[in-house]
């Protein structure tokens, strides 16, 4: 039986590519001439999320896992914004730059929304979808548990600046509370790395909850998710 114990280390080869002046980092490993499996992370993680999964796929597939802009080791876009549209733009160019075809997408959290959106627009380039904790339809506040609703409503208000940009709530509280085991100190240090400095370095983790399509807002994200939800 294969060893599936979690490993805090990430020894997979890393590369980078310049996308519209922004350097995006990504893992690429496995069988170069085999069909690709693309792993897309969400908030507030990075390609590091997939380190243990990739190890079990790399013997038979080409494995790729980008860091979204402003997250992991990827650079920030010059406009300093991290809307769904911004992430989709850079990810589209990343797919083009790496000539991704016949791909299986493995997606989590906001990586699911980005992956579904790309797949809907590029159906001839995918062979499968694997998703977890995914955004498959717009939400209403009635869908939320009361404790989570209060937190996410606060993040969509001025209070979110203090909660996320100063207190780093997504990394320090929400991330470890979302994992069924205790994250190690080494793992936490890697997840903290892009967001060590209070303020704008943490902006991606605040913009994401403000992009969740709740009660029709934001309108553009709601439309996108309604569209790919129907397509799925």
Range-by-range predicted roles:
Residues 58-67:
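Active-site machinery of serine-nucleophile hydrolases
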Residues 2-30, 36, 44, 49, ...:
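Flexible "cap/lid" subdomain of the alpha/beta-hydrolase fold that forms the substrate-access gate
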Residues 51-56:
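Typically the conserved alpha-helix immediately C-terminal to a functionally engaged Cys/Sec
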């Amino acid at each position: 039986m294969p060893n599936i114990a979690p490993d805090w280390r990430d020894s997979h080869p890393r590369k980078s590519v310049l996308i519209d002046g922004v350097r995006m980092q990504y893992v690429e490993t496995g069988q170069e001439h085999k069909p690709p499996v693309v792993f897309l992370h969400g908030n507030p993680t990075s390609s590091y999320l997939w380190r243990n999964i990739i190890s079990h796929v790399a013997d038979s597939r080409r494995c790729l896992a980008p860091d979204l802009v402003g997250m992991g080791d990827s650079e920030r876009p010059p406009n300093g914004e991290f809307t769904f549209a911004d992430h989709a733009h850079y990810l589209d160019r990343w797919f083009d730059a790496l000539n991704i075809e016949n791909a299986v997408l493995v997606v989590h959290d906001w990586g699911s929304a980005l992956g579904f959106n790309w797949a809907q627009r590029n159906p001839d380039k995918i062979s499968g979808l694997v998703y977890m904790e995914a955004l498959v339809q717009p939400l209403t506040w009635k869908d939320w548990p009361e404790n989570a609703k209060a937190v996410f409503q606060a993040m969509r208000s001025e209070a979110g600046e203090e909660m996320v940009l100063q207190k780093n709530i997504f990394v320090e509280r929400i991330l470890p509370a979302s994992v069924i085991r205790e994250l190690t100190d080494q793992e936490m240090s890697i997840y903290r790395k892009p967001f060590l400095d209070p303020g704008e370095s943490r902006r991606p983790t605040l913009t994401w909850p403000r992009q969740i399509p709740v009660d029709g807002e934001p309108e553009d994200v709601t439309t996108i998710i309604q569209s790919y939800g129907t397509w799925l």
